[in-house]
Amino acid sequence: MPDVTVVVPCFNYGRYVEEAVTSALAQHGGAPHVVVVDDGSTDPTTHEVLNRLPDGVDVVRQENRGVCAARNAGLARATTPYLLVLDADDRLRPDALATLLPPLERDPGLGFTYGLMQFFGDWEGVLRMPPYDAYRLLYRHTIGLSALMRAQVFEDTGGFDEAFLQFEDWELWLNALERGWRGRQVDAVTVEYRKHGGSKVGADRRRYKDAYRRLRAKHAGLYRRAPSLAAESAEGRLGRLVYRGFWGPRPVPARVEQLVYERLWRR
């Protein structure tokens, strides 16, 4: 996949990062460019692992500035038309890029594609989110980090907002929407997310609520467009509002879901 760059930010994750890089290099259809950004790691094991990564993997070292800054540094270094961020403790499925790239090549108006997420480690299961819907995206975090995006999306948005410590990927996709880019879900598992004590899933709920308020404040103009986005959503096929949840198909009108999530965040 010579047209794709996979960016792997790493801070003291020597026990995982080699597995992440290997999963990127093992893509069907050819290995992408891989950029690993060492965000000021202090762990000797991490230094040792990064020093033995295969030739061709670009290792960038910087002072510790946080994961968003590390992601942005890697994305800025890329010269390919398509980009994907893979956290150092996660893995790509072997056919991830071969699955995500064709829709982007067929539709020049499409900004990014993403698949389903498989959890492994402390908890296992497939996280099935609803298909892409601009209106629903305002109220629910439905897109994971490891989407394949056009380099132009990164240029237009400026990448990850380094002021966000939670929901930074959600903020990126809202930023893209605000600039006219839409996404598309592919109904296949493309990324494996490691569930462990150091992962952010299950982090303090209060911090998430605060981050959501900041998200809405930053994109207040986009949220004011909610009625027009809702009308656009309602014009779609009913299937867009029916998705397979953890335990089976669930019909959830977007407006109902909005009310539920708004109430949840106010608690």
Regions found by a protein language model. Give the residues of each.
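Short aromatic/hydrophobic "clamp" motif used to bind/position activated sugar donors
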Residues: 83
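N-proximal low-complexity "stem/linker" segments adjacent to membrane-targeting elements
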Residues: 1-23
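Short, acidic, metal-binding catalytic loop of nucleotide-sugar glycosyltransferases
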Residues: 22-31
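Glycine-rich, basic loop-to-helix element that forms the pyrophosphate-binding segment
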Residues: 46, 62-78
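A conserved acidic beta->alpha catalytic loop
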Residues: 38-47, 87
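Catalytic core of nucleotide-sugar-dependent glycosyltransferases
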Residues: 189, 193-196, 202-227
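Acidic donor-binding loop at a coil-to-helix junction in glycosyltransferase catalytic cores
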Residues: 165-174
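Conserved donor NDP-sugar-binding/catalytic core segment of glycosyltransferases
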Residues: 95-126
